[in-house]
A protein has these predicted regions:
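Eukaryote-biased, non-catalytic alpha-solenoid scaffold regions
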Residues: 1-338
Length: 338
């Protein structure tokens, strides 16, 4: 994808500027001038984040004198943005770049006030949290993180994003070696659907010698959380087939995926579920494309050695829908495989 190409390009630019940072002032100034020249081009109009990301890559090349050139460009871009539909977005990017520039020039201690003045900007809050953790000020890191984590609804949670506030909060507790809060946060993330934290909790509880006593109750809580995919993935990993069958019977969601884990031990129950699910799907189907999906499931039933169930099902569907020639045609194709 184009975005991947762009991101790889920016990574390469960052690597180059980090190397040029070690060279003499003349080379650093030339590289910075080139970055500024490119960032000013109209090709970046409408792509504010890419423009400012390019400028960020030039920060490491700056000394106090050359930094004035970069800030002059920032001033110009900020002035132009007043005519945009969303000038506040440019303002945010501007504040981030200026802070990173000042931090580069004067150090984190001398720019802490500027950092906290703009703490509502997520990117800067993350920096403040990392600074606090480096200083082992875990209470401050927790406070900064909780202010955001508590303000967001659980459906905002992005399990795969390491900078999601709830993920950051877990990392804080882990780094601080706060076992009690670590367990509580790991459980919260599991019940929000992050399957990874089942393994995390398993390891922590085993280290405490408390895994067996917490195992069943943790499964019950996960079931009650209604995070079906997460719950079933955990059941599969723990080989909890009886629980998995009960859950699939309560809700046959994705039956033809989960059935493969159950059909060997519970063939009759799975065949019965397949019969019912296919019958109900057929009642809703209206064209050949949907009929093909139905017959694909019948083929799967046959692969699971449910031939007798498949025969009965095909006969019933043929009798129930004699005026659906496309369906009858697809059923006949499957019937030949019996």
């Amino acid at each position: 994808m184009l975005t991947d190409v762009i991101m790889c390009t920016y990574e390469l630019i960052d690597k180059c500027t980090k190397e040029i940072e070690k060279e003499d002032k003349q080379m650093r100034d030339q590289a910075l001038a080139l970055i500024i020249k490119e960032a000013k081009k109209s090709v970046f109009d409408g792509w504010t984040d890419w423009r400012y990301n390019l400028l960020k890559s030039g920060i490491c090349l700056c000394d106090e004198k050359s930094a004035k050139k970069l800030e002059k460009v920032l001033d110009t871009l900020l002035e132009i943005s007043r005519e945009d539909y969303f000038p506040e977005y440019t303002k945010k990017e501007d504040l981030i770049v200026r802070y990173l520039l000042h931090r580069h020039l004067y150090g984190k201690e001398n720019t802490q006030k500027e950092l906290y003045q703009n703490i509502l900007i997520n990117e800067l809050r993350i920096i403040a949290i990392k600074d606090a953790m480096e200083e082992k000020n875990y209470d401050e890191a927790e406070k900064l993180c909780l202010e955001k984590a508590n303000a967001e609804n659980t459906w905002h949670y992005r399990s795969g994003d390491p900078e999601d506030w709830n993920n950051v909060l877990y990392d804080i507790y882990k780094t601080a070696n706060n076992r009690e809060k670590q367990i509580a946060q790991a459980k919260k993330l599991l019940l929000m659907g992050n399957e990874k934290f089942w393994g995390v909790l398993k390891q922590i509880y085993r280290e405490c010698g408390a895994w067996n006593e917490n195992y069943e109750s943790l499964l019950d809580e996960l079931k009650d959380s209604k995070r079906t995919v997460c719950y079933r993935s955990v059941l599969i990993s723990e080989n909890e087939k009886k629980r998995l069958l009960e859950d699939v019977m309560e809700n046959p969601y994705d039956l033809f995926y989960y059935g493969k884990y159950l059909v060997k031990e519970y063939p009759e129950q799975i065949y019965e579920l397949c019969y019912k699910e296919i019958s109900e799907s057929c009642a809703q189907a209206k064209d050949r494309r949907e009929y093909k999906k139905i017959t694909k499931n019948i083929v799967q039933l046959i692969k699971w050695k449910g031939n007798d169930t498949a025969k009965s099902l095909i006969e019933e569907l043929k009798q129930r829908y004699p005026r659906k020639p496309a369906l009858l045609d697809e059923l006949e194709k499957v019937e030949k495989k019996l």
